[in-house]
UniProtKB/Swiss-Prot annotation:
Organism in which the protein naturally occurs: Prochlorococcus marinus (strain MIT 9515)
InterPro entries per record: DHquinase_II (IPR001874), DHquinase_II_CS (IPR018509), DHquinase_II_sf (IPR036441)
Binding residues for substrate: 73, 79, 86, 100-101, 110
Catalytic activity: 3-dehydroquinate = 3-dehydroshikimate + H2O
GO biological process: amino acid biosynthetic process; aromatic amino acid family biosynthetic process; chorismate biosynthetic process; quinate catabolic process
CDD domains from the UniProt entry: DHQase_II
EC number: 4.2.1.10
Protein name in the entry: 3-dehydroquinate dehydratase
Length: 146
């Protein structure tokens, strides 16, 4: 089973960017933690981060034939990107939407997501644990889908 983790803009700054909201772990720390979980479950996990919308769309499209599930924290693109939404829909790859903070308890503009209604699930507000919860969730979903 192949799972793709996508992180959007500014998530490369985790560990230094607003640690009171996002915590002190770096993106590399998160990816290492998830890779350990994936290895224990005999899952192939590919991690990808980009600050560029088109690169994220390209990555989704390039994954159509070899990825069974996607975890995505689209960052600010969650609230703005119809092209990422369309790429996810067009790929037909099941995906879980992730957020470190609870986007529904923040500023008004963060409460709208272009992804939520197409995701198999959303995990928001559990800090860095949102990533591992999402990974466990998509693994179970894919196992039960077979």
């Amino acid at each position: 089973m192949n799972i793709l983790l996508i992180n959007g803009p500014n998530l490369n700054l985790l560990g230094t960017r607003e640690p009171e909201i996002y915590g002190s772990k770096t993106l590399n720390d998160i990816e290492n933690d998830l890779s350990s979980i994936a290895n224990d479950k005999i899952i192939n996990l590919e991690c990808f981060q980009s600050n560029h919308e088109g690169e994220i769309v390209d990555k989704i499209q390039d994954s159509i034939k070899n990825v069974q599930g996607i975890l995505i924290n689209a960052g600010a693109f969650t609230h703005t990107s119809i092209s990422i939404r369309d790429a996810l829909i067009g790929s037909k790859i099941p995906f879980v939407e992730l957020h470190i903070s609870n986007i529904f308890s923040r500023e008004e503009f963060r409460k709208e997501s272009f992804l939520t209604d197409k995701a198999i699930g959303i995990i928001s507000g559990f800090g860095i644990s949102s990533y591992s919860l999402g990974l466990y969730g998509i693994i179970e979903y894919l196992k039960n889908k077979k």
